[in-house]
Amino acid sequence: MKNDVISPEFDENGRPLRRIRSFVRRQGRLTKGQEHALENYWPVMGVEFSEDMLDFPALFGREAPVTLEIGFGMGASLVAMAKDRPEQDFLGIEVHSPGVGACLASAHEEGLSNLRVMCHDAVEVLHKMIPDNSLRMVQLFFPDPWHKARHNKRRIIQVPFAELVKSKLQLGGIFHMATDWEPYAEHMLEVMSSIDGYKNLSESNDYVPRPASRPVTKFEQRGHRLGHGVWDLMFERVK
């Protein structure tokens, strides 16, 4: 499995300016289980980065709606969603190999055939490998909020990124985001509301209740116990 992780920053026209990452590499040490999963299940469920567009029917062996999850962490919610929706296909992207290993192990244990994973930067994957108008949904749950003002430019939700996601969604496709940091939720709302071609699915034109389709993570459960809020945003591509 290759692990060449990079992420470009864009100018106002969406062109890469220079290399800047929206994440911090925290590879950590692989557990024996994660290492075993990477060695044994990656050949079946893993997708290497290339500069060739993916053919989803060929990748999954069928025609089905495809959901892309960016930054799936340890993969618990992604595996749960793939298990609950066998009629759909799921592609997850995560830059940290322990998380990829954990996700592969869980997916194998559940016997999933509708899940594939990548270990690469999602921005480059979107540019180079995801065909336009091909995704039913893009999910971005709890991305790094980059709390300090001087680091705000590292937040993955910026206008060029949201435009890029829109180009990959089918007409009627959904971009679903969630964060537990209210200033980032406000930033997401401002960015998404500024882009022509997206429709906010919130009745109050801000946030939506957590949909049943998004599992509550252990991290989120802990936050609830501590009184922390979570904000979900869902925007539909309408043109």
Curated annotation (Swiss-Prot):
**Which principal EC class is assigned to this enzyme?**
transferase
User: What domain of life is recorded for the organism?
Assistant: Bacteria
Pathway terms, separated by semicolons: tRNA modification; N(7)-methylguanine-tRNA biosynthesis
What's its EC? 2.1.1.33
One Pfam annotation, family name? Methyltransf_4
The record lists substrate as bound by: 148, 180, 217-220
Please provide the record's keywords in A-Z order: Methyltransferase, S-adenosyl-L-methionine, Transferase, tRNA processing
User: What does UniProt list as catalytic?
Assistant: 144
Q: Which GO terms describe its molecular function?
A: tRNA (guanine(46)-N7)-methyltransferase activity
| Residue span of region Interaction with RNA | 150-155
Which residues does S-adenosyl-L-methionine bind? 69, 94, 121, 144
What catalytic activity does the UniProt entry give for this protein? guanosine(46) in tRNA + S-adenosyl-L-methionine = N(7)-methylguanosine(46) in tRNA + S-adenosyl-L-homocysteine
Query: What does the entry list under GO cellular component?
Result: tRNA methyltransferase complex
Q: What does this protein do?
A: Catalyzes the formation of N(7)-methylguanine at position 46 (m7G46) in tRNA.
Q: Which HAMAP family match?
A: tRNA_methyltr_TrmB
Q: Which NCBIfam families match?
A: tRNA (guanosine(46)-N7)-methyltransferase TrmB
Q: Which family does it belong to?
A: Belongs to the class I-like SAM-binding methyltransferase superfamily. TrmB family.
Question: What does the annotation say about its assembly with partners?
Answer: Monomer.
Question: What is this protein identified as?
Answer: tRNA (guanine-N(7)-)-methyltransferase
